[in-house]
Amino acid sequence: FEPGCRNNWHIHKATKGGGQMLIGVAGHGWYQEEGKPAIEILPGTVIHIPANVKHWHGAAADSWFAHLAFEIAGENASNEWLEPVTDEEYDKLK
């Protein structure tokens, strides 16, 4: 991700199992679940995202960012892409 780049809010759906794992590998990034504070991602940070949790992830405003993203196998798994993270939401991150 280039500085300031982030994906839209999205959900990794599954009726059993599922979800996603993120591992920070370079730079500085963010992960946020809807209604919760953002979590900083640095190299070595591991984030487990349960199935059916609305979230987003991306780079910090002043840093390139890279992560490995792994889909966790689940039953009836699918992804739902939602609205963009607004500049107002993103600009609150420190």
Predicted regions and their residues:
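Conserved metal-binding segment of the jelly-roll/cupin
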Residues: 4, 41-62, 72
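A short, sequence-level motif marking secondary-structure junctions
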Residues: 14, 45-47, 87
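Ligand-binding pocket scaffold of soluble enzyme catalytic domains
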Residues: 5, 12, 29-31, 56, ...
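Short, surface-exposed linear segments at secondary-structure transitions and domain or protein termini
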Residues: 19, 49-51, 90-94
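A short beta-strand-loop-beta hairpin characteristic of the jelly-roll/cupin
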Residues: 6, 16-43, 53
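Double-stranded beta-helix
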Residues: 56-94
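Feature marks short, surface-exposed loop/turn motifs that line or immediately flank catalytic pockets
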Residues: 5, 15, 74-76
